[in-house]
Amino acid sequence: MFFRSIFTSAMILFSGSSVVHGANSPGCGKDLPRVQEPGGSYSTNITTKDGRERSYIIHIPSNYDKNEPVPVIFSFHGRTRTAKSQEKLSQFSNEEYNPNAIAVYPQGIKNQWQGDPSSQGIDDISFTLQMLDHFEDRYCIDRTRVYAAGKSNGGGLTNRLACDPTASKRFAAFAPVAGAYYQNVTEDNCRPNTVKIQCNPARTPIPMLAFHGTADETIPYTGGGRRGRCLPSVPHFVREWASRDDLGGKNETTTTNGGKVEVSRFGDHGEVVHYRIEGLGHAWPSTEPNSDNPDGTYVDATPIIMGFFDQWTL
């Protein structure tokens, strides 16, 4: 019932966000691109500034009005996955969860993102900002309500956007799931509970909501050396964000589901929140079976993310 109430509150709040907030983008008043209609998802190409042909899927909410600014949610897939699989996994195109925001699912080059140890020097932060420029020019966007979420390597990119001095000024809040926060430290020198996390946001606080399962064998909760790099432990990652946001070391921790779900909130307004899910593997949390977890788990990440995003604007 607790998580159902979060879901209901999130839908009520988010459904009114375009009325409450009004930082209109230049795209307000323009018709949708040809072949695009409210309620549909469309695969689209874009040529980046370095001449690369990139792609993404964009979902237009059914009630989209070219004169009413709406939020935008970027959702980044995990390594080896695709924009299409991320749309299905994260469910931001499901209007039961997200009735109003445009949802965007970018496609990584070779199905991976900047920050992965095998990435080929592609600047995905620049790519993301170029997409955002394009959307603001072409659609009616509330520029104070742009958000990023992602799974695994996509969660790592979500964190990199939060840490980037330019991107952090254009995104209001961030939600990595089972994030891969690789640091440029060798495995031999990896100290997961103390490793320095490279991060230079241009503002504080940066709202951050992080989900992670204790049984994640791909990106272990305890961190450690992997693929030649160093993964911070998830508690260290979360504490560093609380410190960076000047929230102090104290947090309020609650448990549900017989202690299987632990929720830690830092700051008077919960600027940094962490969901620790006992026994969950490398998965996007859902009470229903999904492509990550055929058995489901104790909580639904997507409506919780929607409720968190609704708290924050630039």
What residue spans do the PLM features occupy?
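The feature captures the conserved acid-bearing segment of alpha/beta-hydrolase catalytic domains
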Residues: A172, A178-T253, R265-D268
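Alpha/beta-hydrolase-fold catalytic nucleophile elbow
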Residues: Q107, A149, A175-A178, L209-H212, ...
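C-terminal catalytic histidine-bearing segment of alpha/beta-hydrolase fold enzymes
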Residues: F211, R229-S233, R239-L314
